[in-house]
Amino acid sequence: MTSRETRAADAAGARQADAQVRSSIDVPPDLVVGLLGSADENLRALERTLSADLHVRGNAVTLCGEPADVALAERVISELIAIVASGQSLTPEVVRHSVAMLVGTGNESPAEVLTLDILSRRGKTIRPKTLNQKRYVDAIDANTIVFGIGPAGTGKTYLAMAKAVHALQTKQVTRIILTRPAVEAGERLGFLPGTLSEKIDPYLRPLYDALYDMMDPELIPKLMSAGVIEVAPLAYMRGRTLNDAFIVLDEAQNTTAEQMKMFLTRLGFGSKVVVTGDVTQIDLPGGARSGLRAAVDILEDIDDIHIAELTSVDVVRHRLVSEIVDAYARYEEPGSGLNRAARRASGARGRR
């Protein structure tokens, strides 16, 4: 390298150094452990998700990097401090969702989103964990009918049931009705062994599991016997008018258009309906069109009906679930079949 090149490189390095900024945030001493996490797991999550360099000494967090990166890191850490100060446990998952919210286009505060209590029982509190979940919950409060559409693990059914239980406990409604289509995955009830109740129960088991997670297990059978809580197949809704009820239709992608119309027209006075489903997991036979897809197309412009969409970003199960959802979405994109066939053919030729 010539002396001219050396001087140019030094000048470029100096300009880059000048562009770097430093900032320091003092964390209240009693919140440091909660912010950093067990064995500094939250700090490591911050280091993985933020571009700015982080250094912790005592209760001071020093940030260094490009101005925009440092500004984002300041916002993230301030929000996380507010979350810890509210008494909520901070986890790497909460860190990841908080960063995603602030990187996005919304103006919502992660501390406000992640500390919104929906339902509490024996020290366990159910809250939205992502911005879209918060918007979904707000839509349920503001509208009579809400469609919650998204992949597995986005909390669409669990949050709807939490809102239903809360509405019952606060006397906004007098009963809860939980329903699902009773035929899924290509099975027919008539070919399954057991009584009708024994055949139907496995399809409704996820709803029972969620109920027992939210309410006193000893109270649930009494409420069901009194008709305050009803868990039933969708076919049992026909011919009824459901007043003063919070009604949740789960797995709605497996309804036909006729079933969906029948269900929605059961709506009575003082009732609220939440319809949840995943349009990528339709099990209807013969390629029949999903009633959920049809309803969204037909009803999306009607006032007091809201369509809430959740994505892989809102998956709150294991981190891999979000990646699996995205991988399947890419695999099933139009035209990707040709690419898969080409890859298989190429692989076959390579094995010869």
Swiss-Prot record:
Q: Where is the composition biased (Low complexity)?
A: 9-20
The Gene Ontology CC terms held by the record are:
cytosol; plasma membrane
Cite a single GO MF annotation: RNA binding
Keyword tRNA-binding on this protein? no
Task: List ligand-binding residues for ATP.
Answer: G150, P151, A152, G153, T154, G155, K156, T157
Q: Where in the cell is it found?
A: Cytoplasm
Instruction: Assign the protein's first listed, main location to one coarse class.
Output: cytoplasm
What keyword terms does UniProt attach to this protein? ATP-binding, Cytoplasm, Nucleotide-binding
The superkingdom of the source organism is Bacteria
| Keyword presence, ATP-binding | yes
**SMART domains the UniProt entry points to:** KH (SM00322)
Region annotated Disordered sits at 1-21
The family line of this record is: Belongs to the PhoH family.
What's the protein called, per UniProt?
PhoH-like protein
